[in-house]
Amino acid sequence: MKFKIDLHGMPITKAISKAESVLIEASFDKNMQCEIITGKSGNMQQRILDEVIKPYKFDYYIPPHNTGTIIVTQNEL
């Protein structure tokens, strides 16, 4: 299932909390793919990676054509 979260312009603490709750809920679907829109804020993107995506060991990539987005997929355990 595909999910999309737009965090652009959101306060960083609220954005981290929202990303975490959506990714945890979405992770129950083994075919999950979530597009997280951070905008061009390198700080927000790095914090989402460091505080949500990496600790939960999700797979992710940042598309070269849209660096304000993180694509997250489920890592099979």
What does each of the following model-derived ranges do?
Residues 1-77:
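Long, charged, low-complexity intrinsically disordered regions
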